Curated annotation (Swiss-Prot):
Domain called PpiC: residue spans: 181-282, 292-390
Domain notes: The PPIase activity resides only in the second parvulin domain. The N-terminal region and the C-terminal tail are necessary and sufficient for the chaperone activity of SurA. The PPIase activity is dispensable for SurA to function as a chaperone. The N-terminal region and the C-terminal tail are also required for porin recognition.
Organism: Dechloromonas aromatica (strain RCB)
Keyword set includes Chaperone: yes
UniProt-recorded name of the protein: Chaperone SurA
Protein's job: Chaperone involved in the correct folding and assembly of outer membrane proteins. Recognizes specific patterns of aromatic residues and the orientation of their side chains, which are found more frequently in integral outer membrane proteins. May act in both early periplasmic and late outer membrane-associated steps of protein maturation.
Top-level taxon in the UniProt lineage: Bacteria
Gene Ontology biological-process annotations: Gram-negative-bacterium-type cell outer membrane assembly; protein folding; protein stabilization
Signal peptide: 1-28
Main location: periplasm
Gene Ontology MF terms in the entry: peptide binding; peptidyl-prolyl cis-trans isomerase activity; unfolded protein binding
Amino acid sequence: MKTMNPYIRHLILLICCLGGMLAQPLSAAPQDPVEADRIVAVVGSDVITYFELRTRLTAALKQLQKQGTPLPPQDVLERQMLERLIMERAQLQYGRETGMKIDDTQLDLAIGRIAAGNKMTVPQFRAALEKDGVQYAQFREEIRNEMVTVRLREREVDSKLVISEGEIDNYLANQTATGSEEEYQLAHILLRAPESATPEQLQKLRQRGEQALKRARAGENFAQLTAAFSDAPDALQGGDLGWRPLARLPALYAEAGSRLQSGEVSDLLRSSAGFHIVKLVSKRGGSAPASVQQTHARHILIRSSEVLSEAEATRKLEAVRERIANGVDFAEQARLYSQDGSAAKGGELGWLNPGDTVPEFERAMDALKINEVSQVVQSPFGMHLIQVLERRERDVSAERQRAVARQALRERKLDEAYQDWLRQLRDRTYVENRLDEQ
């Protein structure tokens, strides 16, 4: 049997929150059935049990051990993990209330893509999961939940971001003035503040932030501090933001990061989301891109409606994809079935630049090889089949520079907007924390 790629295994352990017993003085779940069923939080109409919390915490500790991160105190991690579970439940509940659904057909497609990305069939992938101790039924539900939260972010945050022409002008002027685009690797800690926080709450949060900052500047492991203090989704990954030019970082982080030397930690920063600490891990030079990669693609679009559900549209496109795989011409199928204006041209979209299409479409297109046909892809416009015909590098014209700038600014704003949305959602969700109750 094929073995699972370690990185995929790591992600699955993180997503599913499953895992074996640890060498820590911590059991994967309490032995006492009464303790296991104890409710540690009420989130709207849902509850979180102690068993769920300990199962998730076991996986988190296993992840931190693999990374070689020194472990924070157990009670600190327990509280941090419960807050993450509360945020997940709040999002899932909001998704249900607003009609966000992932049907089995869409779920099967997603799992098929995960398996294919790991060079396995779905049965092979399922066997590999079960060999690692991951129950397939639970894995499916966790993936379904992940898909709901991603769709929520796209609907509630991504689609509402607005980039003005003035912002683009300022971005391009700054790029011209600097002549280069250095990249920064930042790590961060976020202490999220309630939307209507009282002065007492803010003072308590500030003191907590100052405590974390003092320990960071004393040389304590930043990843450990992130796991112990941060409310950000990437807390268990050390708060690592990866390599980004300043233009693609939240403005607050870009300003702070530009003043730091490698290894230095910022002051305690304040934003509408709460308090932040930023560490510059490293910095490297670069130059502003003189060209972009263009993609020549075509697609077939079927829109869902009151008379055609998303599942039915998906099945219809799957049948089209199978015919194409058996030798039927893509352009012919586009003319017959596509509901896009490009149907008459066989689905031709011409040469596309970064930012020309919606993010869901672009991500799927960028992952394809030449002549490869995608699985069914969902975007705000409907369901798509995408085929990449060619790729090329082209000089960035003034128009294209603006498109690239728009995308960079969008990425910069997205993190801030998402954190604001999460904070607002948390504040309007009824939450009762019972962790300390015996």
